[in-house]
């Protein structure tokens, strides 16, 4: 059977520009929120008072004036900018490339296995999962960003190039856990978004969604993604925020979490993450889906 051709396929330039713009807008609004979320996930033990919460969030600036507290939430901004923009370009412009490939070569298989509507949505989800696994090549930037946010002492006065030279492949520590987190997380993100467009809004061409439709379907995808990936995300974050000279394996962290903190520790930071990372992901996903068609029309 001949492959189904995609209509109104956006240019790759529009995908890159739209994704980069979404990443820049996201970073400018949500970097402090991301810092708070990472620090809460990295905290061991229970928070029992507002004073303790203040210390966990603001670290050394806990007793500082308000302005200094605010600026303390912007550590590693350079790493964050580089990582976030590259990651959004890769994720939001890369998924359509994989989706186009699957559509041209395996669309009939998806439709036959899952049905026409579900097959299309699962194809989008599968493309997202494949791209999500590939994100591990960005791990060094992610590691540097998280360490700067949660464990700045790990830098010990070294610059980024010195760290890259010293640590080499150690910066990919936890790559397996990252891939294990990204595969279902990205599947749920793009799958939830696609299913909402397919069955709630009855869209035949997902790129024709309105801003409201993109916003609503992004909420569905982002919520599913964060819940599905939460346990592995906690492990990944703890692997990455350890000192360079005192690493711990994911299985050691897993064992200690079960032994000392209990099963609920795997969902530490989930509520603030849904309230903080959730809007961030919804915002960037909505903007990418809206800006890519916009730039495609603008550049034609």
Curated annotation (Swiss-Prot):
Membrane-spanning intervals of the chain: 16-36, 70-86, 121-141, 178-198, 215-235, 275-295
Species this chain originates from: Schizosaccharomyces pombe (strain 972 / ATCC 24843)
Keyword Nucleotide-binding attached: no
Solcar repeat locations: 10-101, 119-199, 212-294
Compartment(s): Mitochondrion inner membrane
Single annotated GO MF: guanine nucleotide transmembrane transporter activity
Transmembrane listed as a keyword: yes
Annotated PROSITE patterns: SOLCAR
Name of the protein in question: Uncharacterized mitochondrial carrier C1682.09c
One of the protein's GO biological processes: mitochondrial guanine nucleotide transmembrane transport
The entry's keywords: Membrane, Mitochondrion, Mitochondrion inner membrane, Repeat, Transmembrane, Transmembrane helix, Transport
Membrane topology type: Multi-pass membrane protein
Main location: mitochondrion
Family: Belongs to the mitochondrial carrier (TC 2.A.29) family.
């Amino acid at each position: 059977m001949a492959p189904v051709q995609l209509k109104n396929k956006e240019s790759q330039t529009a995908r890159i520009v739209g994704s980069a713009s979404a990443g820049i807008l996201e970073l400018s609004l949500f970097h402090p929120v991301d810092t708070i979320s990472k620090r809460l996930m990295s905290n061991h033990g229970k928070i029992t008072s507002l004073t303790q919460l203040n210390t966990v969030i603001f670290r050394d600036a806990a007793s500082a004036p308000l302005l200094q507290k605010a600026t303390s939430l912007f550590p590693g901004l350079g790493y964050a900018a580089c990582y976030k923009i590259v990651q959004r370009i890769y994720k939001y412009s890369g998924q359509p490339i994989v989706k186009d490939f699957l559509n041209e070569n395996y669309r009939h298989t998806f439709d036959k296995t899952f049905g026409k509507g579900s097959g299309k949505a699962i194809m989008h989800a599968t493309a997202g999962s494949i791209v999500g696994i590939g994100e591990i090549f960005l791990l060094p930037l992610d590691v540097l960003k998280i360490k700067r946010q949660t464990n700045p002492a790990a830098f010990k006065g070294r610059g980024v190039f010195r760290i890259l030279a010293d640590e080499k492949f150690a910066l990919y520590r936890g790559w397996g856990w990252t891939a294990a987190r990204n595969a279902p997380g990205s599947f749920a993100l793009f799958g939830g978004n696609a299913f909402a467009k397919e069955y709630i809004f009855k869209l035949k061409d997902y790129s024709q969604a309105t801003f409201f439709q993109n916003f609503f379907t992004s909420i569905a995808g982002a919520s599913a993604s964060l819940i599905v990936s939460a346990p592995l995300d906690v492990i990944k974050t703890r692997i990455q925020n350890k000192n360079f000279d005192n690493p711990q394996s994911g299985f050691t962290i897993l064992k200690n979490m079960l032994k000392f903190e209990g099963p609920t520790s795997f969902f530490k930071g989930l509520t603030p993450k849904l309230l903080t990372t959730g809007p961030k992901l919804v915002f960037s996903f909505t903007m990418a889906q809206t800006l890519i068609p916009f730039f495609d029309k603008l550049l034609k």
